[in-house]
């Protein structure tokens, strides 16, 4: 990945990334041609290759950009929500889930699916480098939950009975599946219902583990 520092060059690079992310989400990685990205971003072939070594290099940069923007967006949404009590670590997990639900609601008019999900489907079986990076993306999502799950488990006295890392990954699986169900059913309440079940499952799991 090539490094640029000038404001104009940075703006051009970000425009290419934004259009690539949009097209990857809408059409998929394999069906999106570099020429389409260049046209959508209004850049020449020379300008494109000034910033990226090729489509693969661009794909990794799209993932990095997506994860950074996702994290920033969720943090900003959380700051506008009522905070949980200091002694309620599970409330921090629920706050993140509520922020995810709000972020999805804000983006429901966008065409195309989740770029992470789309690239996972398209590339995990055919490109080991992308498979590893996409796995890191999902694990990065899981790490947002794990510290709060650790605290909740310690609070319940269930430290020897709950694998918080696998529990965090389970949450990510529910989140990603709920996003797909919401889109395919075109039911904006689908995610809310699934998250309600998830929250109740987490409450009961920790309560059961402490007995």
Label each residue range with its predicted role:
Residues 103, 107, 121, 171-189, ...:
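Amphipathic C-terminal alpha-helical segment
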Residues 17, 71, 94, 142-150, ...:
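An amphipathic alpha-helix signature
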Residues 61, 75-112, 164, 168-171:
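Hydrophobic alpha-helical connector segments
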């Amino acid at each position: 990945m090539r490094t640029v520092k000038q404001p104009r060059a940075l703006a051009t690079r970000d425009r290419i990334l934004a259009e690539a992310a949009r097209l990857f989400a809408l059409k998929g990685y394999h069906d999106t041609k570099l020429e389409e990205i260049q046209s959508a971003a209004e850049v020449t072939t020379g300008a494109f290759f000034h910033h990226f070594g090729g489509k693969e290099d661009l794909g990794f940069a799209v993932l990095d950009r997506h994860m950074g923007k996702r994290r920033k967006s969720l943090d900003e949404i959380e700051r506008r929500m009522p905070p949980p009590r200091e002694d309620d670590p599970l409330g921090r997990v629920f706050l993140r889930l509520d922020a995810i639900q709000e972020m999805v609601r804000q983006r429901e008019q966008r065409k195309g699916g989740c770029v992470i999900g789309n690239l996972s489907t398209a590339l995990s079986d055919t490109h080991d480098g992308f498979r590893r990076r996409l796995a890191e993306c999902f694990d990065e999502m899981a790490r947002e939950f794990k510290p709060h799950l650790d605290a909740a488990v310690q609070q319940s006295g269930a430290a020897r009975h709950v694998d918080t890392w696998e529990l965090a990954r389970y949450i990510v699986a529910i989140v990603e599946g709920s996003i797909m169900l919401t889109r395919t059913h075109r039911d904006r309440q689908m995610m809310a219902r699934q998250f309600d079940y998830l929250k109740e499952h987490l409450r009961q799991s920790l309560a059961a583990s402490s007995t």
